[in-house]
Amino acid sequence: MRSFSGAVWERQVSLGAPSWPAAMGDRIYSLEARAVARSVLARPRRPRAPRPRLRLRGRPGRGRGGLLGAGPREACLATPGPPTPPCSSGTSQTPPAPGQMKSKERHLCSPSDHRRSRSPSQRRSRSRSSSWGRDRRHSDSLKESRHRRSSYSQSKSRSKSLPRQSTSLRQSRTPRRNSGSRGRSRSKSLPKRSKSMEKSQSRSPQKQTGSGAKSRPHGRHCDSIARSPCKSPRAYTSSGSKTQTTKHSHLRSHSRSRSYHHKNSW
């Protein structure tokens, strides 16, 4: 606008016209007046700009100023700080003031009030949901443990009832699950049983009779008899087989009772 008005002023001066405001046409004067009016109208509006209000609205809990404040906020506003510098228009003083007072009151007042007023229902629902999940988990684990206990007790009772039946069924050559290292059939388990018999006799000295010292070579010879009977001498075979059969019948009863007690111990 200044460059245009300057050009017009130069023209008017060169043409010998009177002073500038009188020489300016109505159109140019109206444009200048409009520009000045716009600038004058824009100056008081600057403090009233929507930016601070938008900032206050953008923050949660600072919605429409301290004019509609509740009880604790009004109590805080009753003790004002230093007055804020007034803007060009008197009415525009209110929007920045509540924000400042709010920031001050948040520090001055007890923070528990605001914490309480923020979201107690949310907090309650959160705690409820978490405790509900915990209870649910706890009940599930309880059910699982009960189920485990019941299944364990059932299996225990089954294992207790099994050996009684198996004592009668063990004479048949069906392999048993809990027979362990005593072999699947009698013909295979003869050498193993003789070894276990030797161990038991060496452990318990009160069971050893007068022939206890001779029991070890007899056992070894019996192993060789079971593996290759033609190599061993005849005298040993007749006496050894007799002693072995008697000892084995005795040992079978012992091993059965031992396995029965061992299974029932746990």
Curated annotation (Swiss-Prot):
Bias kind Polar residues: ranges: 202-212, 235-244
Localization terms from the record: Nucleus
GO biological process: mRNA 5'-splice site recognition; regulation of alternative mRNA splicing, via spliceosome
Protein keywords: mRNA processing, mRNA splicing, Nucleus
Disordered: annotated span: 42-266
Highest taxon listed in the record's lineage: Eukaryota
GO CC field: nucleus
Ranges annotated as biased composition (Basic and acidic residues): 102-114, 133-144
Biased segments, Low complexity type: 151-166
Feature: compositional bias, Basic residues: 43-62, 115-127, 183-194, 245-266
Family: Belongs to the splicing factor SR family.
Function: Splicing factor that seems to antagonize SR proteins in pre-mRNA splicing regulation.
Name listed for the protein in its UniProt record: Serine/arginine-rich splicing factor 12
Organism listed in the record: Mus musculus
Taxonomy of the source species: Eukaryota, Metazoa, Chordata, Craniata, Vertebrata
Gene name linked to the record: Srsf12
